[in-house]
Amino acid sequence: MIRQRTLKQLVHATGVGLHSGRKVSLTFRPAPVNTGIVYVRTDLQPEVELRADAQFVRDTVLCTALVNEQGVRISTVEHLSAALASLGIDNLYVEVDAPEVPVMDGSAHPFIYLLQSGGIEEQSLPKQFIRIKKKIRVEDGDKWAEFAPYRRGFRMDLQIDFRHPVFDKQNQHLVFDFSGSKFAKEISRARTFGFMKDIEYLHSQNLALGGSLDNAVVLDDYRVLNEEGLRYEDEFVKHKLLDAIGDLYMCNHSILGQFTAYKTGHAINNKLLRALLADAEAWEMVTFEEEAAKSPIAYFGTKLVLA
């Protein structure tokens, strides 16, 4: 049987908020079966819980933010969400003492390491997957994204289109058959990126106050400004794919199907996920309860193998 997963023990870390620039404390706590991923604002009295849910994604400007009906928010959840997807973690309490998850190094890599350090616990009930049954597509001008049936796990086909000298030298198209180990080794270290020309405006809007060359790839009009350069030759499209994995895991379940997108971002990813969940004929919930069943997605293991 393919079982639900949580952590074996509590994990604590600190980091900087991407938009606030403030220190943020982060704690992962194991959760019972069928809890889902629950974010908790511990700086509020009483504490406020926000369950990872496509319907609670109410802000997608520069990040994915969960916002409840009272306006309480937790921002920048997408990189952590991608790490959770790669490890197949179904149930977890994520506690933060600020309105956002710390950005760490701008990728999913530190979150994978932290989660692994807590150990992965397989639980008593079967893991539930969302299987795509028919094509669903959303568009916004020339940008679009779609789901389609695919019987061999989760395939992603993503293309970006940035006009810039650095991007012109890169492959801006990526096809990726999702597995946890491949994600950890080939995708997870891809960092968020931005342009110097936008930073002054962002700061005027109280955004990206914690952004730096330590947690983002920054470009001027001609080149990458980070001394160490890029982590992957195609780091930009890989980060967009990382974002999409995190955004789509807002349904609290791994998806079995094909995701294809052109110039997508947080808003379109969420729009597609909402469109899917709103159409009961487009998907079904499946489990693999046979004793010898193999998971259609190979999740990253529990050994600390990341360098």
From Swiss-Prot:
Q: Which biological pathway?
A: Glycolipid biosynthesis; lipid IV(A) biosynthesis; lipid IV(A) from (3R)-3-hydroxytetradecanoyl-[acyl-carrier-protein] and UDP-N-acetyl-alpha-D-glucosamine: step 2/6
Organism encoding this protein: Tolumonas auensis (strain DSM 9187 / NBRC 110442 / TA 4)
- Positions annotated to bind Zn(2+): 79, 239, 243
Named from the GO MF annotations, one term is: UDP-3-O-acyl-N-acetylglucosamine deacetylase activity
Cofactor(s) listed: Zn(2+)
The reaction(s) this protein catalyses: a UDP-3-O-[(3R)-3-hydroxyacyl]-N-acetyl-alpha-D-glucosamine + H2O = a UDP-3-O-[(3R)-3-hydroxyacyl]-alpha-D-glucosamine + acetate
Q: What is its EC number?
A: 3.5.1.108
Q: What is this protein called?
A: UDP-3-O-acyl-N-acetylglucosamine deacetylase
Offer a single GO CC term for the protein: membrane
Using the UniProt record, name the top-level EC class of this enzyme in a single word.
hydrolase
| Keywords linked to the UniProt accession | Hydrolase, Lipid A biosynthesis, Lipid biosynthesis, Lipid metabolism, Metal-binding, Zinc
Q: Where is the active site?
A: 266
What this chain does, per the entry, is described as: Catalyzes the hydrolysis of UDP-3-O-myristoyl-N-acetylglucosamine to form UDP-3-O-myristoylglucosamine and acetate, the committed step in lipid A biosynthesis.
**Where on the tree of life does the source sit, at the highest rank?**
Bacteria
GO biological process terms held by the UniProt record: lipid A biosynthetic process
Which family is annotated? Belongs to the LpxC family.
